[in-house]
Amino acid sequence: MDQSGMEIPVTLIIKAPNQKYSDQTISCFLNWTVGKLKTHLSNVYPSKPLTKDQRLVYSGRLLPDHLQLKDILRKQDEYHMVHLVCTSRTPPSSPKSSTNRESHEALASSSNSSSDHSGSTTPSSGQETLSLAVGSSSEGLRQRTLPQAQTDQAQSHQFPYVMQGNVDNQFPGQAAPPGFPVYPAFSPLQMLWWQQMYAHQYYMQYQAAVSAQATSNVNPTQPTTSQPLNLAHVPGEEPPPAPNLVAQENRPMNENVQMNAQGGPVLNEEDFNRDWLDWMYTFSRAAILLSIVYFYSSFSRFIMVMGAMLLVYLHQAGWFPFRQEGGHQQAPNNNAEVNNDGQNANNLELEEMERLMDDGLEDESGEDGGEDASAIQRPGLMASAWSFITTFFTSLIPEGPPQVAN
């Protein structure tokens, strides 16, 4: 019963992937193995493939020979699609050999036709035909290599640095692997000419790079060498550019100038284009603020607030600066002196050096004198308290506009 149940017929549709043969319908049994099915196909299939060359694929799976069909095929399908792939034992011939074979056959047929037409031919005429055939083939080879040689010349002209590495490989017999024929694209004279052109081009580029580097190295050294030369000519005096530098440092700057990102002064349109409506808005805000202070405080507080606002306004306008340094007051006087006589700067520097030397001698005179001077320079308690209070309250007031433009 089991064997009769196992021998159930099943229909397989064998498809060839190369579409060389049409789909073949094969009847077999479920108890067959894949190897037995291959043996059956080697007898039934039109191409008669060998068993070892067959590959059966079912549902994207390669079927091994030991499996049975009942374990592979789906029972709900009536027809089962199996793809047959056969390995090729004879490799395809190259088209180059076929063309050579055709050319040889054409030569043989032409020689036979010429011999039949002339009746009897001498060996010399046969040699002439062979020489003509060889000449035609050599002309074909020459025509075939001519475009390649032209492209090689163009490439070598565009990229001359490639020629240096390929010079040794172009000559026959040098750096050529054994067993390979060498067909040089250029003659030795052409190769020497290309090498000379490459050397000339390389020399010109090298000279340009060296000259550019020399000029870049000379330019930054000129300012550094000019100063020692001036010092050598005038050893006892300061160099002439010193008064100019002092004049530039003591030159009065334009105050209250704002700079924009492009480097020019900022033109504040609000200062120039303020119409009557803007002024009315400003006065109304000030009136509202003063009315609130007047009605919700006493008269004395109102006077204090008015005085504080007036003080802040004068400080913002620059009429009443709280933190004015002495350097800004002395700058116009120094600038006038420098403009009148350039030697005054040197005299001031000499006087400053003499004063420092005198101070150093006074400091070395005795320890008691130094202690007395330090005691005299120490501020008192009241002066410290007054400076602390004034500094604290003046720091609460906002600073005015910048005095020096950036």
From Swiss-Prot:
SUPFAM superfamilies for the chain: Ubiquitin-like
Role this protein plays: Could be involved in the unfolded protein response (UPR) pathway.
Transmembrane parts of this sequence: 302-322
Keywords, in A-Z order: Membrane, Transmembrane, Transmembrane helix, Unfolded protein response
Species: Homo sapiens
Lineage: Eukaryota, Metazoa, Chordata, Craniata, Vertebrata
Residue ranges of domain Ubiquitin-like in the record: 10-89
Region (Disordered): 86-154
SMART domains on file: UBQ
Gene field: HERPUD2
Biased composition (Low complexity): 87-98, 106-126
Protein name, per record: Homocysteine-responsive endoplasmic reticulum-resident ubiquitin-like domain member 2 protein
Lipid bilayer topology: Single-pass membrane protein
A single cellular component GO annotation: membrane
Keyword Cell membrane carried by entry: no
Cross-referenced PROSITE patterns: UBIQUITIN_2
